[in-house]
Amino acid sequence: MDNRLRNAAEVNYIDIAMPDVKGNTVKLSEVEGKVVMVYFWASENAEQKMFNLDVVKPVYADYKDKGFEIYAVSLDTDKAKWATTVRNQELDWINVCDGRGSASPVVTTYNVQSIPSLFFLVDGDLVSSTGVRNEATLRSFLAAHLR
C-alpha cells in the first residue's frame, strides 16, 4: 500500500511535502495552527495575485496570531517567477511549489479542479470549505473555527 494512503488513515488527509522559496522541504503535517488553510494557486494568474493582496493578506494579518496558518501550494511551472511573486507581494505564510504545475501529483490527490482552491485543516482534521471564496466567507469560516 502506498505510504501516502497509510498516513492518510492516521490523519484524514494526505500529506504534502514540497520545497519553499528557500528550497527547504516543508510538510503540511508539520504546520502548526488550529486552522490551516491549504491554498492552491498560481502566480501566473493576475486574478490570483489580486486575491492574495485583496483577500488572503488582510485576513492572514488579522488571524495569524489567533491560530490561523496558510500552506500555499503554487501550481506554477516557473519556480523563479513564483518565488519573485512571493517576495514582491510579501506573502509571509508558508509557500511551496514543486514546479510541475497541473502535472503535480497534489492536483489529483486533492482533486483540484480550479484555482484558487481552498481546503481547511481544523485541529488536524480536513473539513469541508464549501462556500469559502471571498474575504467575508473566509472571515466567517475562521471566526467559527477559531474560538
Locations of regions flagged by a protein language model:
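Hydrophobic beta-strand anchors of alpha/beta hydrolase catalytic cores
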Residues: 37-38, 70, 118
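Conserved redox-active cysteine motifs that mediate thiol-disulfide chemistry
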Residues: 33, 37-57
